[in-house]
Design a protein with these regions (language model features):
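Flexible coil/turn and secondary-structure edge motifs
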Residues: 1-186
Length: 186
């Protein structure tokens, strides 16, 4: 079944588009995190889904049960000639509190943990540098230790259509996502 992106107008796919790279972020409710990437020049597609767990093709209800180990995630396809990975990472780190472990604000559970799934090892250095720089900023502002997991992209399962671009379709919809107020200097 083809899904059309509500913001960009193109087809949503789990495959990375030609001449783009992808990265997957988990940082709380995927509705709010996805919205953060829509207006960035160089981002060509976003979608929400589930990754990092053990169940094939999980449903939202299964993920929320906590038994699948999946995380609510946002897949960002971008043109590396138009936007750098560090700029996407800045949005990610500043959008949520990566020190909260298995929660983001009022959203509690393993599906809300902070993760970065990279396409290949070439991206790991940039991601780890950004983590270390943001950790320093957090410590300087009396926050705790970052709990974000970094690993190679595992299987990505597209979430149900009603979750895709949810806050564009429902501008007054719930979003408990909130950052720390700290800025990434990279």
């Amino acid at each position: 079944m083809m899904m059309k992106h509500f913001v960009y107008g193109n087809e949503i796919s789990t495959n990375t588009l030609k001449e783009t790279k992808s990265i997957i972020f988990g940082g709380g409710c995927f509705w709010g995190l996805e919205k953060k990437f829509w207006e960035l020049s160089g981002v060509v597609l976003t979608s929400v889904g589930y990754s990092g767990g053990k169940t094939e093709n999980p449903s939202y209800e299964e993920v929320c049960s906590g038994f699948t180990d999946h995380v609510e995630v946002v897949k960002v396809d971008y043109k590396p000639n138009d936007i750098e990975l560090k700029d996407l990472l800045r949005v990610f780190w500043e959008a949520h509190d990566p020190t909260q472990g298995m929660r983001q604000g009022n959203d509690i559970g393993s599906q809300y943990r902070s993760v970065v799934f990279i396409e290949d090892e070439a991206d790991r250095d940039v991601v780890e540098l950004s983590l270390n720089l943001f950790q320093e900023e957090l410590y300087n502002n009396n926050f705790g230790t970052i709990t974000t997991e970094i690993s190679i992209t595992e299987k990505y399962f597209l979430a149900e259509e009603y979750h895709q671009q949810y806050l564009a379709k429902n501008p007054n919809g719930y979003c408990g996502l909130g950052g720390t107020g700290c800025k990434l200097k990279i």
